[in-house]
């Protein structure tokens, strides 16, 4: 009887090991990005959403030189993607202002970033060469105009660094 129990326990252990190997965590980017980044390697991912669904989620995905060329080509025709530099509305949401700045309407403003990391600093590094993406999930549009004036913000933003071949993506739900 004990040999049967041992055999069953061994089979159960093997089954659990196989199941955990097959059913590992998969990280999927927001569908609103409209691009396939599955050929990249996830360098970092965390989800800070709470029980009510508010919070921030972050992805960092690196690409090989070959895959980066194909990925960059897809960004050129995907909805919501633009070559850098960022427009001012998106820049304010992602990085805030550096001290007090004169806005386009002539007013002086100081804005903290909305999309921040766990330490409160901007979630994305500053990038000189690449592409950016923004999708306002509340209006289902690819513009950041008016987002800061709302009592809640729900958006997905991403920047792709052509030099390091890295995609940074973040989602904010408030």
Where are these regions (language model features)?
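Functional cores of ribonucleases/endoribonucleases
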Residues: 82-166
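Sparse, context-dependent recognition of short Cys/His-centered cofactor- or disulfide-binding micro-motifs
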Residues: 3, 8, 44-46, 143, ...
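Gram-positive cell-envelope targeting signals
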Residues: 1-26
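Short, solvent-exposed mixed-charge patches
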Residues: 173-174
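Extended hydrophobic/Leu-rich segments
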Residues: 8-10, 16, 75, 109, ...
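Short, well-ordered helical secondary-structure segments
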Residues: 10, 48-50, 147
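N-terminal export/targeting and maturation segments
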Residues: 19-88
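Conserved beta-strand-loop-alpha-helix junction that forms the acyl-donor binding cleft
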Residues: 170
């Amino acid at each position: 009887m004990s040999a049967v129990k041992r055999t069953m326990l061994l089979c159960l252990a093997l089954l659990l090991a196989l199941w955990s190997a097959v059913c590992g965590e998969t990280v999927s980017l927001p569908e609103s990005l409209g691009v396939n980044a599955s050929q990249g390697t996830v360098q970092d991912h965390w989800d800070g959403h709470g029980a009510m669904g508010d919070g921030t989620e972050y992805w960092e995905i690196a690409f090989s030189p070959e895959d980066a060329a194909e990925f960059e080509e897809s960004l050129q025709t995907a909805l919501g993607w633009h070559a850098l530099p960022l427009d001012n509305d998106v820049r304010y949401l992602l990085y805030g202002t550096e001290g007090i700045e004169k806005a386009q309407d002539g007013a002086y403003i100081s804005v903290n970033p909305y999309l921040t990391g766990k330490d409160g600093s901007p979630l994305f590094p500053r990038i000189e060469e690449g592409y950016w993406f923004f999708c306002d999930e509340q209006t289902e549009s690819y513009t950041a105009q008016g987002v800061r004036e709302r009592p809640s913000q729900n958006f997905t933003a991403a920047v792709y660094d052509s030099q390091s071949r890295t995609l940074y993506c973040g989602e904010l739900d408030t």
